[in-house]
Design a protein with these regions (language model features):
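Transmembrane and membrane-interface helices of multi-pass
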Residues: 2-152
């Protein structure tokens, strides 16, 4: 059986994948939020520093995972999945209770799961399926296209 060769991207290609992937993670996160994506982008256009401040945690995570794994596609896939799931949880919580997801809610996970039975939740299965499909596609790209290894 013939083994398929994986292609290795140039350092510029790897940097481009990381940059576009970070923007994709940000847009995915914003698209999962409650409200209009266009109105959110308009508010970022009025205050560009807000976009940068919202983007840097995703960029930091993507770069950290890239330096740990050495693959830009896996990094972008993981970053999109983590931030997308946080945005998805925020969407469901805002619709159910009217208040946003905060880090302290993680400590209340078991209590929240017990209380979830009291709510009629719209789980937005289509959005969740699209998020997971996108992350799987990005991970598959990591199998087919290898990134150049990070050098310090």
């Amino acid at each position: 059986m013939k083994k398929r060769k994986s292609h290795i991207m140039s350092p510029a290609g790897t940097a481009l994948v990381l940059l576009l992937g970070i923007l994709l993670a940000a847009m995915t996160t914003l698209a999962l939020e409650q409200g209009s994506l266009l109105s959110t982008l308009e508010s970022f256009r009025a205050e560009p520093v807000l976009f940068v401040l919202n983007l840097w945690p995703m960029a930091a995570m993507a770069l950290l995972v890239y330096f740990l794994l050495g693959n830009a596609w896996y990094s972008v896939s993981f970053t999109t999945l983590v931030w997308g799931l946080l945005s998805y949880v925020n969407l469901v919580k805002v619709e159910a209770r009217g208040d946003p997801f905060v880090p302290g809610d993680i400590l209340l996970l078991t209590e929240g799961m017990e209380a979830a039975g009291n709510y009629q939740l719209d789980m937005h299965w289509g959005k969740l399926a699209l998020l997971l499909g996108l992350c799987l596609l990005l991970a598959f790209m990591g199998i087919r296209l290898k990134s150049s290894r990070p050098r310090l």
